[in-house]
Curated annotation (Swiss-Prot):
Residues 1-83 are annotated as: Disordered. It comes from the Eukaryota. PROSITE patterns: ZINC_FINGER_C2H2_2 (PS50157). InterPro entries: Znf_C2H2_type. This is CPX chromosomal region candidate gene 1 protein homolog. Residues 21-32, 44-60 have a biased composition (Polar residues).
Length: 321
């Protein structure tokens, strides 16, 4: 058993030792803190030094970069506009039959006709899409391209699936007649101009609206001032030498022998072939355009008929009609 006096002295001695140790620890902290603070200050100063010039340089570099970006954007926009303006149109190859090639004496033997088609923007309204475009047509003659200016109108994108010469002739007839009748509406004497369109129908005894064929021939007393391609595309097919009928245009059509698919089967029989040739005679018919559509016009009595059967059965029929 220890006495309370010894225990009190021990506790007092421990407290004194602790009090002596505490100042030593404080001194170490005081000594270590100055050594740590300069490092922190140096790092902070170096970071601030490194950051301040960097911010200045980044601000200085941002200005030319923004200017360069704006210049690149403007150049890209200009290039896109120039590409849209200088965009080459599409090429459409249209085969030409030999009968039409023979008329092109000044161009020689042409292989095909290239028509430049304009790309149509579907976002634009129809009024803007249906405008006339003046482009060029390339006629390849003897491997030498010859440029011809043509004028055409496009409303929508289209294809031309040519199968035979019959479809080509019917297309030419439709295009020319539509162009002529549109010009005739501007004239005062429209009936006189419309009556100049004479068509000779093939096989009148077995005529149907689905089977007919026509061939263009040169009108009489007519002088051609321009080549065939330019006349067909510009709307002025020919010009008459008669000064009284100034700027009156005519398209004369002749009949040809057309044999249907049913009649082809009877060609092996001689009698059937003779019957086809026997009834193949020329019959002149005048077709005019009215507000109600196409009509058959009788040049003798001046009456109009809706069908060819009515024209044949009326009272003033004759072998030459």
């Amino acid at each position: 058993m220890s006495s309370p006096t010894k225990e009190g002295s021990d506790t007092a001695g421990n407290a004194h030792k602790n009090s002596e140790n505490e100042p030593s620890n404080d001194c170490t902290t005081d000594i270590e803190s100055p050594s740590a603070d300069p490092n922190m200050i140096y790092q902070v100063e170096t970071n601030s030094i490194n950051r301040e010039p960097g911010t200045a340089t980044s601000q200085e570099d941002a200005v030319p970069q923004a200017a360069a970006n704006t210049e690149l954007e403007t150049e890209i926009q200009k290039d896109q506009r120039e590409e849209d303006i200088k965009e080459e149109p599409l090429l459409l190859q249209i085969p030409i039959p030999r009968k039409l090639i023979s008329l092109m004496s000044e161009l020689g033997r042409g292989n095909y006709l290239r028509i430049l088609l304009v790309k149509i923007d579907q976002n634009k309204p129809l009024n803007d899409r249906s405008k006339s475009h003046s482009e060029k047509a390339e006629m390849k003659a003897n491997n030498c391209p010859v440029n011809r200016k043509i004028r055409f109108r496009l409303s929508t994108s289209w294809r031309v699936p040519f199968i035979n010469n019959h479809e080509i002739r019917s297309m030419i007839l439709r295009l020319l007649c539509e162009r002529y009748f549109s010009q005739a509406e501007e004239c005062q004497d429209t009936m006189w101009v419309k009556q100049n369109y004479i068509a000779c129908l093939y096989r009148p005894n077995s005529f149907t609206h689905h089977e007919r064929t026509v061939i263009f021939r040169r009108p009489l007393r007519v002088r051609y001032h321009r080549p065939l391609t330019e006349r067909m595309t510009s709307g002025k097919f020919c010009k008459s030498t008669d000064m009284k009928g100034k700027y009156r245009f005519r398209a004369i059509v002749r009949s040809v022998l057309f044999v249907s698919h049913v009649q082809l089967q009877s060609l092996f029989n001689r009698k059937g072939f003779v019957d086809i040739l026997r009834y193949n005679h020329t019959r002149k018919v005048m077709i005019i355009s009215t507000n109600n559509g196409w009509k058959y016009f009788c040049p003798i009595c001046g009456r109009l008929f809706n069908t060819y059967f009515e024209l044949r059965r009326h009272s003033c029929r004759s072998p030459g009609n």
